[in-house]
Amino acid sequence: ADYNTAYFAPFTYEDSMYGFPALTGGTCTVVIYDKAMWKEAGYDQFPSTWEDVEKASEYFNGKGITTVAFGNGGKWQANSDFLSTLGNRYTGPDWFMSLVAKNGAAFTDDTFVSALTEMQRLFTDTKIFNEDFNVVTNEDAREYYISGDAAAFIGGNWDESYIWAALKDADEEKFNNMGFAVLPQPADATQAPNSQNIGLGYAVAINSKLADDPEKLAAAIDLAE
């Protein structure tokens, strides 16, 4: 089979698998941007570095437009939709796997602290994001993009699906100008600039109590499949 066995990693412990991945695609961190708005700002595509995004914010702020909309009102979005990717740009995948395996990596390591420092800088020392980012949710922030009050939005693939559906019939021009990009690279990050996170937090597991009831076990497996 062509099934990627790496998908089992989050649900494997000491060579035993405890769940079958139910979500193996999509991303928690996608940049959705209005190509026409960024073209007017002098960019043919969304910038690949935060330095250029910060430069672009001078133009958008002058127009009364938020450069990038983001919502952390639920207090999970900053980690899932931003730091998970930004952190990897500093630490790399080996650090993460070492952390999972409890093999030496720690959140106090210099590379991860650097990621936290950069994230704090981006949200508090620049004017890239909406001022209420820590109050509004991702659902609120994506409306800033839909309404044209923001030139870009960062969220998950579920947000992309919502924006796609909202604009498809309501605003054909804006729908056709939707662009997608990976999270920009920080100036002092040394790991892969195009790295991306993926949602692997869900799995289907069979109740071990069904082992003594073949009929129910077969039904559960059939349902899971």
Predicted regions and their residues:
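Short, solvent-exposed loop/beta-turn-alpha elements that line the ligand-binding surface or hinge
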Residues: 1-3, 89-114, 167-173, 185-195
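Extracytoplasmic "Venus flytrap"/periplasmic binding protein-like
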Residues: 1-12, 36-48, 143-144, 151-152, ...
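Extracytoplasmic/periplasmic substrate-recognition and gating elements
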Residues: 41, 126, 168-225
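Short helix-initiation/N-cap motifs at beta->coil->alpha
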Residues: 48-54, 131-146
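A local structural motif
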Residues: 41-45, 121-136, 149, 172-177
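Hinge/lid segment of periplasmic solute-binding proteins
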Residues: 1-30, 54, 60, 81, ...
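Glycine-centered hinge/linker elements that transmit conformational signals in sensory
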Residues: 57, 101-133
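Alpha-to-beta junction loops
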Residues: 64-67, 147-155
